[in-house]
Amino acid sequence: SVIICFLSALCKVNGIHLDPMEMIMTAKAAENQYVGVSCGKLDQSCEVLSKKDHLLYLDTKDDSYELISVNENMKPYKIAIFFSGLERSLKNSKYNLRQDECKAAAYALMGYAGMNYDTFANTRLRDVPFEVFEAYKNRLPELWRRRAEHYYSEFDRAEKGANLWRKGDLEGYGQLVFE
């Protein structure tokens, strides 16, 4: 979020207009190339595209998104955000290694399935259908399999969360968030 703030300020004082996707991709490039974190664009997309009283449903594969408004069936709610006092630095964590483990799993799965694949750097689990994972997961080293299982479970959780929000099931959505 600091990079988005700095970028917004630099654009404002220099009379530069960046559309939302340019803002997101420029911030991502700064994180990747200057901070040294091999992050995607989820955080930057949330910071740029989010809107009050809406859930941001984002597909980072094709950059499509949907702002799902509050459903009239929802009970009134308040969301509190606070600083826990805990700080973490992705640069000094195993984040980049975990991302490489996910790429390795995707690359292997694509190879096992005879799928066309790109370079290792451009390989993502998002490009591997769940059915391919299910068919070949036992060929993966345990660590890669666990990383892929986590990815697919989170993908499924995001889908379920968006559907619960659309229905106005805030209680179900809240339970899903805390799983």
Sequence positions of predicted segments:
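Gly/Ser-rich oxyanion-binding loop with an adjacent helix/lid
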Residues: 1-72
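C-terminal nucleotide
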Residues: 54-179
